[in-house]
Amino acid sequence: MTQSLPPKNIVFYADDDLDDLELVKDAFAQYAKDVEVLTATDGSKALSYLSNLKKYDTIPCLIILDVNMPVIDGKETLLRLREMEHFQEVPVVLFTTSSQPIDKNFAQRYNAGFITKPIDVKQMEFIADKFIDHCADDIRNRIRRQMQ
């Protein structure tokens, strides 16, 4: 019997700011070696990638969206994700420079987290820690379903 490695935790992050993309990738790389951060630079590319995942592909256990992106912004991306069956329950965090109540309310209405930029590596590590446990639970549940 061949024993396979456990699936890697996937975090998907869409942001047009390359510095922010690197900050998030670095924080997850330092904090959790079993997390792979996949990225896109706008909502359209994010939706294209996510909608093309096949049945047996690893679904991200966390999606982080910048609110102010070109082509399709983070809010519209969130709305479209919530319409997709595989992503209705996946945790999403809106990551933005805005601290406006209307943006926070939007995130709450669509069951998403809300984090205001700028943040530093220490804050990002805290955020990574907060969501890694969820990713681990998600992976365990997927393995159980596959074994049934």
Language model features: what each stretch is:
Residues 15, 61, 65-66:
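Active-site residues of response regulator receiver
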Residues 117-118:
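A Lys-centered signature of the CheY-like receiver
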Residues 133-148:
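CheY-like receiver
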Residues 69:
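Receiver (REC) domain active-site loop signature in two-component systems and cognate sites
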Residues 8-28:
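Conserved acidic segment of CheY-like receiver
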Residues 39-62:
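Acidic, metal-coordinating helix/loop segments flanking the phosphotransfer/catalytic sites
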